[in-house]
Amino acid sequence: MLVGFLLVVFNYAALAYITATHFELLVAPIMKDINTLIRNNRRWSRLLKEEDPGFFERLSLAQKPRFLWIGCSDSRVPAERLTGLEPGELFVHRNVANLVVHTDLNCLSVVQYAVEVLEVEHIIICGHYGCGGVQAALENPELGLIDNWLLHIRDLWYKHSALLGELPPEKRVDKLCEINVIEQVYNLGHSTIMQSAWKRGQNVNIHGWVYGIQDGYLRDLEVTATNREILEQRYRHGIANLLNDPDLNP
């Protein structure tokens, strides 16, 4: 009986050792990656303090950004980095395919806070070429929950499919990326938040940009809206410009 008991204890200890070793082998690479982020943060903080000893003290007092950025969640489109801005200079909201949907309380709460509390002067809606969300909306695969979100882009595809369908797939995606930005500028301009802000004379402008991951350049789609009347004009002008593109009318 004693021998049997010792065998059980030995087997349990061996199993525990193997399990712990296996766990360590699995977790160690993950923790190494995570710890790299912490080390990077320490290095960044140290260098910034060396360049500007009072930076974090000033930053901790308040934020007063002049810009709100509504962009795509894509990791290749880092808003502050590609605009050359520092912490505290850009208020940021990101979602898949940079959509402004009137039922999205998350986005609208960000916009309201930015406009009414921070009093930003500029709201930039920025898409990017080769957007995976736009491409998925075109190809219409079954992705799960996100399919409901992509319906907003799919509606734009149906709206302009007669012309966009003439383009090769890559250009079709990029053109729809541009159309999507213009439509989101229009959506935001028609929100009660922006309508109220313009009505009370607040100086806040909406811009539509597209970022090129291939070259790192931001492109202004020239649909900047400063009030409701300008919004309607710029929307019509912007869509007409895109649909009159030589690629669409060879």
Predicted regions located by residue number:
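Active-site cofactor/substrate anionic-group-binding motifs, chiefly glycine-
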Residues: 76, 80-110
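Intrinsic-disorder/low-complexity regions
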Residues: 10-11, 18, 39-40
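Divalent-metal-activated hydrolytic enzyme cores
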Residues: 30-65, 97-121, 132-250
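Hydrophobic alpha-helical signal peptides and transmembrane signal-/tail-anchor segments
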Residues: 1-11
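Short, Lys/Arg-enriched N-terminal segments with co-localized hydrophobic residues
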Residues: 15-30
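Gly/Ser/Thr-rich loops at beta-strand to alpha-helix junctions
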Residues: 74-76, 128-133
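N-terminal short beta-loop-beta anion/metal-coordinating cradle
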Residues: 48-89
